[in-house]
């Protein structure tokens, strides 16, 4: 959501995208998680949109034993890979929703939508790499 707002889908340029998100949620085809909501900065245009438009169920809770268990498995896997220490620390940082998003999708049999692509690089843990490792489907906004 944050990258979409900054790049291709600015509110002033493409308001239909944001209406589409709400329609997809209403149809039961789209959710996000509480950790993503928590990353959105107060005073930001996206913050205002979330709190004025997104229903409370739009952001699923990651506070379940099943999600925490999957997240833990992902942290163990990431730490066992050849990623740089900085990449591992960034992925595990309390403010980073990426691992939680994949864990939530795994537990709930959902598809992760991301602008990231698979990468052999070791400087950043990419969502598609974690999805592949844990059997979670992913796509980008154009799929």
Language-model features: where?
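Catalytic-site beta-strand/loop segments enriched in glycine and acidic/polar residues
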Residues: 78-84, 106-116
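Acidic, PIN/NYN-like endoribonuclease modules and their adjacent C-terminal/linker elements
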Residues: 118-143
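PIN-domain endoribonuclease scaffold, especially VapC-family toxins
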Residues: 37-92
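Acidic, metal-associated active-site segment
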Residues: 92-112, 126, 130
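Short, well-structured N-terminal submotif of metal-dependent ribonuclease cores
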Residues: 1-53
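Acidic, metal-coordinating catalytic cores used for nucleic-acid/nucleotide bond scission
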Residues: 38-39, 93-97, 117-123
């Amino acid at each position: 959501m944050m990258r979409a707002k900054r790049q291709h889908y600015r509110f002033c340029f493409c308001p239909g995208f944001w209406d589409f998100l709400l329609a997809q949620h209403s149809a039961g085809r789209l959710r996000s998680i509480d950790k993503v909501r928590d990353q959105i900065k107060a005073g930001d245009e996206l913050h205002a949109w979330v709190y004025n438009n997104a229903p409370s169920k739009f952001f699923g809770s990651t506070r379940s034993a099943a999600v925490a268990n999957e997240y833990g498995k992902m942290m163990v896997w990431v730490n066992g890979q050849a990623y740089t220490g900085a990449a591992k620390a960034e992925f595990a940082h309390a403010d980073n929703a990426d691992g939680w998003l994949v864990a939530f999708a795994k537990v709930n049999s959902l598809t992760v939508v991301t602008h990231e692509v698979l990468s052999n690089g070791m400087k950043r843990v990419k969502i598609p790499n974690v999805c592949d490792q844990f059997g979670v489907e992913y796509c980008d906004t154009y799929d």
